[in-house]
């Protein structure tokens, strides 16, 4: 994320994304949500240095489909696309199965929301 292009994120989203970006001097560009607070995936088909999307979005709780995320990932094959699934257990569809298909897709999760394990650090990995 250290190139001249900016990473893209929705303008209404998890509040720490911009904080962490500033902390590490990563430039960001916020993409406005539509009037109904949904993400227009076409807005993420522009030059960028990466994308981060909470799905379902925090705080709107609106999710985009696996197919829409796959379109974003395909269109940005030379850039990392991070999908934050902190709230996926409350609604939405996981895109974890897509990580086998796309090297540029990173899915992050937390156990603090749906499992009430805030503060516990757990690492899950594939044994292969």
Where are these regions (language model features)?
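Active-site phosphate-binding strand-loop segment of PLP-dependent enzymes
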Residues: 34-85, 89
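Short strand-turn motif at the edge of the Rossmann-like AdoMet-binding core
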Residues: 12, 85-87, 110-111
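Phosphate-binding glycine-rich loop
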Residues: 1-6, 24
């Amino acid at each position: 994320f250290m190139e001249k292009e900016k990473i893209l994120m929705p303008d209404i989203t998890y509040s720490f994304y911009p904080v962490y970006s500033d902390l590490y001097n990563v430039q960001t560009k916020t993409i406005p949500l539509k009037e109904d607070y949904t993400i227009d995936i076409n807005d993420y088909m522009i030059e960028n240095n990466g994308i981060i999307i909470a799905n379902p979005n925090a705080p709107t709780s609106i999710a985009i489909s696996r197919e829409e995320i796959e379109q974003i990932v395909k269109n940005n094959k030379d850039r990392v696309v991070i999908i934050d699934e902190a709230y996926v257990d409350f609604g939405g569809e996981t895109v974890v199965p897509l990580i086998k298909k796309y090297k540029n897709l990173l899915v992050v999760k937390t156990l603090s929301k749906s499992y009430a394990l805030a503060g516990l650090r757990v690492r899950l990995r594939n044994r292969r």
